[in-house]
A protein has these predicted regions:
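Helix-loop-helix units of permease transmembrane domains in multi-pass membrane transporters
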Residues: 62-95
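Membrane-helix interface segments
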Residues: 84, 113, 140-144
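Hydrophobic alpha-helical transmembrane segments
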Residues: 1-51, 56-67, 125, 133-141, ...
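Non-cytosolic membrane-interface motifs at loop->transmembrane helix junctions
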Residues: 40-49, 113-121, 170-178
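Hydrophobic alpha-helical transmembrane segments and immediately flanking/interface helices
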Residues: 112-134
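Aromatic-anchored segments of alpha-helical transmembrane domains
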Residues: 24-33, 98-105, 149-161
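Transmembrane helix segments
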Residues: 141-183
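Hydrophobic alpha-helical transmembrane segments that constitute the membrane-spanning cores
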Residues: 85-115
Length: 209
């Protein structure tokens, strides 16, 4: 399935994250920037993008995979091309591209947001890979959406109580040293989950009558 058909088949579900990331977040950052306080600007960009951009990546995967997993007669979608990983990766790239221009604008305010954008890309890749994997593992899109939601809550809200070791939330922004150490493991985890998802996809045989 081509990327245009994939987006069209999702309807407004695809555009909800785009509108949020490309309209609401920049609008909030714009109003914060008017205060002239660099700390507040950095805090707004870091908190809002880390809370919502990766999770919405997971949301897009769920909306796209629903027709393959949950709909009646879903076997028809697996006749010509059973493996859906290439569709997921195309959606991931389009989603990232729609957000890149805004981070370029944020970099005009603070060049360090370039590292933050790499951080967001890595974490979003992890969310996308995990959701793709869980769709076939649980054989349910609804169940597949839960881990990403819980991980977001753990990282952003439960940080003080459960520790920082597995959290992706970086309230003070991203540092090059941390990006090249801790987040290498995030990339590896994302690749492993995508590979497991591929294997589960290839062996998938649950078709709804």
């Amino acid at each position: 399935m081509g990327i245009k058909i994939s987006i069209k088949s999702m309807g407004m579900s695809f555009y909800i994250p785009i509108i949020f990331n490309s309209l609401l977040i920049p609008l909030i950052v714009f109003f914060v920037a008017r205060t002239g306080n660099e700390y507040n600007i950095a805090f707004a960009v870091n908190v809002l993008t880390q809370m919502f951009t990766p999770f919405f990546g997971s949301f897009i995967v769920c909306m796209h995979m629903s027709k393959y997993i949950d709909t009646r007669g879903n076997e028809i979608y697996f006749v010509l091309n059973k493996n859906k990983s290439h569709e997921i990766m195309k959606l991931f790239l389009v989603y990232i591209m729609t957000n890149t221009c805004w981070f370029a604008a944020y970099m005009l305010l603070d060049r360090s947001f370039g590292l933050e954008w790499l951080h967001i890309i890595i974490v979003t890749f992890l969310f996308v890979s995990a959701t793709y994997c869980f769709c076939f593992f649980f054989r349910s899109v609804s169940l597949a959406s839960i881990p990403g939601f819980l991980y977001t809550i753990y990282s952003v809200v439960g940080l003080k109580y459960l520790g920082k070791k597995f959290s992706y939330y970086e309230q003070t922004g991203m540092e090059a040293e941390k990006l090249s150490s801790k987040y290498v493991y995030f990339i590896i985890a994302a690749i492993v989950l995508m590979s497991i998802g591929n294997a589960l996809n290839d062996s998938y045989d649950k078709y709804n009558e």
